Curated annotation (Swiss-Prot):
Cofactor: Mn(2+)
Binding site for Mn(2+) 1: 8, 10, 41, 197
Catalysed reaction, written as an equation: UDP-2-N,3-O-bis[(3R)-3-hydroxytetradecanoyl]-alpha-D-glucosamine + H2O = 2-N,3-O-bis[(3R)-3-hydroxytetradecanoyl]-alpha-D-glucosaminyl 1-phosphate + UMP + 2 H(+)
Pathway annotation from the record: Glycolipid biosynthesis; lipid IV(A) biosynthesis; lipid IV(A) from (3R)-3-hydroxytetradecanoyl-[acyl-carrier-protein] and UDP-N-acetyl-alpha-D-glucosamine: step 4/6
GO terms under cellular component: cytoplasm; extrinsic component of plasma membrane
Organism: Escherichia coli O157:H7
Protein name (database record): UDP-2,3-diacylglucosamine hydrolase
Length: 240
């Protein structure tokens, strides 16, 4: 058996091929797993569990079917869907996890997260992240009428795209010291995350021992998952 990890699908109505690929994944590979972990940015945007977007209901039903089949499903918030709440989690049969979670998998101690907190060189983003994660601000935003939230979300995505266009790729990648610090804080030799859209398996030293950082790919033109078994940790790409 295997435990599966995915991230950065950025589901939206404008990308039906990605949605179709995810549905096939849920109906196939996911049903064979010991567990499925979604490490953030499942959706391109999330303005509240009360958004009647049919895509959200469709995805909730599809994930719930996996959960109901006996495969537990877990979710860590990303930078795009950090407002995804208990209502959607309940509808989809997912368990919400904290932003950093340590798992014991087949004899390995593995830290999982979305990965945006590791990009500490991007001071502008980290300041923005701190602001939008304030509970009072989230409560205020979610109390706004849906049409107002949609307008704000469109403006924020446009601002983010403009800001990122002027940033170097290095700034938007993880900071190595932040990676080592997180792994040593949790006493792990394995880290799995997404966010950067740069799939790879990196070797490093943490806790004065060899360690590994496995980065999930985004679902732009193909699927990406990490498959952990008793024998191996594999980064796998597959067609939609």
């Amino acid at each position: 058996m295997a435990t599966l990890f995915i991230a950065d699908l950025h589901l939206c109505v404008e990308e039906p091929a990605i949605t179709a690929g995810f549905l096939r994944f849920l109906a196939g590979e996911a049903r064979k797993a010991d567990a499925l972990y979604i490490l953030g940015d499942l959706f391109e945007a999330w303005i509240g569990d009360d958004d009647p977007n049919p895509l959200h209901r469709q995805m909730a039903a599809a994930i719930k079917a996996v959960s109901d089949s006996g495969v537990p499903c877990y979710f860590i918030h990303g930078n795009r869907d950090f407002l995804l709440g208990k209502r959607f989690a309940r509808e989809s049969g997912m368990t919400l996890l904290p932003e950093e979670k340590v798992l014991e998998l087949y004899g390995r101690r593995v830290l999982i997260m979305h990965g945006d907190t590791l990009c500490t060189d991007d001071a502008g983003y980290q300041a923005f992240r701190t602001k939008v994660h304030k509970p009072w601000l989230q409560t205020l935003f979610l109390a706004l009428p849906l049409f107002v939230r949609k307008r704000i979300a469109v403006r924020m995505r446009a601002n983010s795209k403009e800001a990122n266009s002027s940033k170097s790729l290095a700034i938007m990648d993880v900071n190595q010291n932040a990676v080592v610090s997180a792994m040593e804080k949790h006493q792990v030799q394995w880290l799995i995350h997404g966010h950067t859209h740069r799939p790879a398996v990196h070797e490093l030293i943490a806790n004065q021992q060899p360690a590994f950082r496995v980065v999930l790919g985004a679902w732009h033109t193909e699927g990406s998952m990490v498959k952990v078994t008793a024998d191996d940790v594999e980064l796998i790409h597959f067609p939609f």
